[in-house]
Regions:
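Glycine-rich oxoanion-binding loops at beta->alpha junctions
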Residues: 52-106, 115, 154-156, 168
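Accessory alpha-helical/coil subdomains and C-terminal extensions
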Residues: 99, 107-112, 118-133, 153-292
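C-terminal non-catalytic interaction/assembly regions of soluble proteins
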Residues: 256-410
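Glycine-rich beta-alpha junction loops
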Residues: 43-47, 141-145, 187-192, 216-222, ...
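N-terminal phosphate-binding or glycine-rich loops at protein starts, especially the Walker A/P-loop
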Residues: 2-54
């Protein structure tokens, strides 16, 4: 059989282990020289591919350099937020597949979240329509953990570890003074509160901070919120409150919109930020206590020093599994994670495949049964779910300047 080439791209927001998934795809691809002639990378995703921004991994990351991907945050190949047309009749599709043919592409991999799986769906359906032999596989990625039909996603474990660690550190800082204070920590999560829920992992004992966790799965009432804080001050001096950026009221209005209007991105998603600052001002004006807000922002997804070893290992495994599946003829699928336990009840994960058409444009939220009846905490079921995903540390090599050594695209 004539050799063909493999191409891989990254899309959407990066994570601390999206490059580990990339390493898994590339390293596995390079172990099949009898079948795969070249392993290419799309610089800036499908948008860069349109503009012929392509690299050959054997030239770009020779030898041991490839392994450096596993401790480098960000997206080595760069990213994009390009949305393919809904209609498969659009001329963009034949133009794309002409480029695939010119590059002798046999396998296409896209590492990303919900919108990226939409791209995988469209390309695989168009390939089937025209009888193209190209195999199209989606590799999951998102710190939001909101992809359906998978136990969890690569990137969530490391982001959850960062959130829990940072919340514990902020709690330690807030406890310095014996003066009533409220610290509000705003955490990423538009409609799904998985990452904010992970702040519960910071607690060292029952009743420890963060005392309040507000997720977008439950409507937020600012008057009830203020009453809850007043009651908590009867027993606690310093209160830590963790909120998802996407918390909203019963009418569906985002709390961040109380203070200002918000724009939208290329996919029509509202660009949320600022609910923490709004609540800070609310607490200060209504309760008359010291208030501070902290927005974790992009640091949640780019902390190499707190990469979960479990997350990294699973991301690499997913990348390798996807290549093996594609070589076996699979297409139009996303690699999924299936949770299992060994004979002693310890956490294990195995990979599976799911129809990408059942995944794209769907969203997995935190089950309401994992949120307490008062709406501002999570249950032990969530703790048991999330704790295995943050386990283990990795060693990040340091340079002569004492700072982490990452690999960069030239």
């Amino acid at each position: 059989m004539a050799k063909k080439n493999l191409i891989v791209g990254q899309s959407g927001g990066p994570t601390a282990v999206i490059n580990s998934s990339l390493y898994g795809v590339v390293s596995e691809g390079l172990t099949h020289p009898d079948t795969i002639e070249h392993v290419y990378g799309m610089v800036n995703g499908i948008e860069g591919f349109f503009n012929d921004h392509i690299l050959d991994f054997e030239e770009a990351l020779p030898g041991d350099k490839l392994k450096w991907l596993t401790h480098t945050p960000g997206a080595y190949l760069g990213s994009c937020r390009y949305k393919l047309p809904e209609s498969l009749e659009d001329p963009v599709y034949p133009a794309l597949f002409k480029k695939f043919e010119e590059l002798n592409i046999g396998w296409f991999f896209y590492i990303g979240g919900n919108d990226s799986m939409d791209t995988v769906s469209k390309l695989s359906r168009y390939a089937e329509r025209i009888g193209s032999p190209i195999r199209v596989i989606g590799e999951p990625k998102t710190i939001d953990n909101d992809l359906v039909h998978t136990d969890h996603t690569p990137g969530f474990g490391s982001a959850a570890k960062y959130v829990a660690s940072t919340v514990r550190e902020i709690t330690t800082d807030a406890n310095v003074y014996e003066k009533k204070s409220v610290t509000i920590i705003e955490i990423m999560g538009r409609h799904a509160g998985w990452l904010t829920a992970a702040s519960a992992l910071a607690r060292k004992y029952d009743g420890d901070n963060p005392l309040f966790i507000y997720l977008p799965e439950v409507a937020f009432d600012q008057d009830v919120f203020l009453k809850d804080l007043e009651k908590a001050f009867e027993k606690n001096c310093n209160l830590i409150v963790c909120v998802s950026e996407g918390i909203h009221d019963a009418d569906g209005t985002f709390i961040c919109e109380y203070d200002s209007s918000v724009g939208t991105d290329t996919f029509g998603h509202k660009m949320l930020a600022g609910c923490g600052k709004y609540l800070e001002n609310l607490v200060r004006s209504r309760l008359g206590v010291k208030a501070r807000s902290v927005e974790l922002n992009v640091s949640q997804r780019c902390s190499a020093s707190l990469i979960s070893a479990t997350d990294q290992k699973e991301a690499i495994t997913a990348g390798k599994f996807g290549v093996q599946a594609a070589l076996n003829g699979e297409t139009g699928k996303m690699v999924s994670f299936i949770r299992q336990t060994d004979s002693e009840g310890n956490y294990q994960m195995v990979c599976g495949l799911e129809d990408v058409n059942a995944i794209c444009n769907e969203e997995k939220t935190v089950p309401l049964t994992w949120i307490t009846s008062d709406g501002h905490n999570v249950t032990e079921d969530f703790i048991r779910y999330a704790r295995p995903l943050i386990q283990g540390n990795i060693e990040v090599p340091l340079g002569e300047d004492g700072l982490p050594k990452f690999v960069y695209r030239k």
